[in-house]
UniProtKB/Swiss-Prot annotation:
Light-harvesting photosynthetic bile pigment-protein from the phycobiliprotein complex. GO terms for biological process: photosynthesis. It comes from Nostoc sp. (strain PCC 7120 / SAG 25.82 / UTEX 2576). GO terms for cellular component: phycobilisome; plasma membrane-derived thylakoid membrane. This is Phycoerythrocyanin alpha chain.
């Protein structure tokens, strides 16, 4: 999994040398942001389920047809609603992993890769998840550097889905 730390080490190893000044700056940058990243990950751990449920309700309000149309990709049944919350929760959990490692590696490997094919095959609209993640970003209640760390990866996921 790619992270700022593994990329710096890999680049130095390929050259057969110690970390360069630029690579050391990347490593120090990660450590400087680590406290905020871990606090953001903790916020996701503490609130992720609640955020996923609130985001799903926002999606149902923004796209009312999702609760009115039948089919496995819609939220017209309790099972459909449960799947929607589960999917949003999966995004949020993966974003929390990004906050821990300080890079987009978890999203790239576990979510973004093959995402459009998966959504297409299942008849899922990326706009539902974009709306859900935007809702979480705009309503998570985090502040300062912690919000900044969370929002980096929320925005990355939103852009990947767009």
């Amino acid at each position: 999994m790619k992270t700022p730390l593994t990329e710096a080490i890999s680049a130095a190893d390929v050259r057969g040398s110690y970390l360069s000044n630029t690579e050391m700056q990347a490593v120090f940058g990660r450590f400087n942001r680590a406290r905020a990243g871990l606090a953001a990950a903790q916020a996701f751990s503490n609130n992720g389920k609640k955020w996923a449920e609130a985001a799903a309700n926002h999606v149902y309000q923004k796209f009312p047809y999702t609760t009115q149309m039948s089919g496995p990709q819609y939220a017209s049944t309790p099972e459909g609603k449960s799947k929607c919350v589960r999917d949003i929760d999966h995004y949020l959990r993966t974003i929390s992993y990004c906050c821990v490692v300080g890079g987009t590696g978890p999203l790239d490997e576990y979510v973004v890769s093959g995402l459009s094919e998966l959504n297409s095959a299942l008849g899922l609209s990326p706009s539902w998840y974009v709306a859900a993640l935007e809702f979480v970003r705009d309503n998570h209640g985090l502040n300062g550097d912690v919000a900044g760390e969370a929002n980096i990866y929320l925005n990355y996921a939103i852009n990947a889905l767009s």
